[in-house]
A protein has these predicted regions:
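Short inter-helical turns and helix N-cap capping residues of alpha-solenoid HEAT/ARM repeat scaffolds
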Residues: 2, 27-34, 66, 111, ...
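Amphipathic alpha-helical scaffolding segments comprising HEAT/armadillo-like alpha-solenoid repeats
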Residues: 16-27, 50-55, 114, 128-134
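Long, non-transmembrane cytosolic or organellar matrix-exposed soluble domains/tails
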Residues: 81-194
């Protein structure tokens, strides 16, 4: 029984988003044992994330400028948010905590991937003005980077910004921005549809 539980928890930690929806659905089952098992597993997942996040927050308090701890905490919160476990009051506060951590990380690391993660959160929360600031900054710092250009494209599509997309197409052609074949095909298919 203990081994079975340990294996199940290991699977849940490896792919929580795939399993959380099933566990939440199982909580509505008519079988009391299934409901109990699903509830216990969800509680265990919450506990695991909470403990990990709290430990990392404590470490960060002791070493506030440690980029590795900050990255681990960002990843833990990112995983927690993606898991589907966040609900209620945490549904609003967790993304804000994540944004605050990403802002801190951007100030220390100045890496494109962190700006894109921050921009992704602004996009998800519908914070267009802040997203625009991120895109403008990346345009100055990394205008030729494929990762930036793909994110810029995704943001423009998500916002339904036709004028922005026209400028995007013109800019990547003028600058001759390298895009992988896969990304080029996706962008070209959208261009044809527009």
């Amino acid at each position: 029984s203990a081994i079975k539980r340990e294996l199940t928890m290991s699977m849940l930690k490896d792919q929580p988003s795939n399993v959380v929806a099933l566990l939440q659905q199982a909580r509505m089952n008519e079988d009391v044992e299934v409901v109990h098992y699903a509830t216990v597993m969800l509680a265990e997942l919450h506990k695991e994330y909470d403990l990990k996040i709290q430990e990392l927050k404590q470490e960060l308090l002791k070493q506030p400028d440690d980029i590795d701890i900050l990255e681990k905490l960002c990843l833990a919160l990112e995983d927690y948010l993606a898991s589907g476990l966040v609900a209620g009051k945490f549904d609003e506060s967790s993304p804000r905590q994540y944004i605050d951590l990403l802002r801190r990380k951007v100030a220390i690391s100045h890496e494109l991937k962190d700006y894109l993660r921050l921009g992704g959160q602004y996009l998800a929360l519908g914070e267009g003005q802040r997203l625009r600031q991120i895109l403008d900054y990346c345009q100055v710092e990394w205008p030729m980077e494929e990762a930036y250009r793909v994110f810029q494209f995704q943001a423009l599509v998500a916002q339904g910004d036709r004028l922005g997309l026209q400028q995007f197409y013109q800019d990547i052609e003028t600058r001759q921005v390298y895009l992988s074949r896969h990304n080029r095909q996706i962008i070209d298919s959208w261009r044809i549809q527009a």
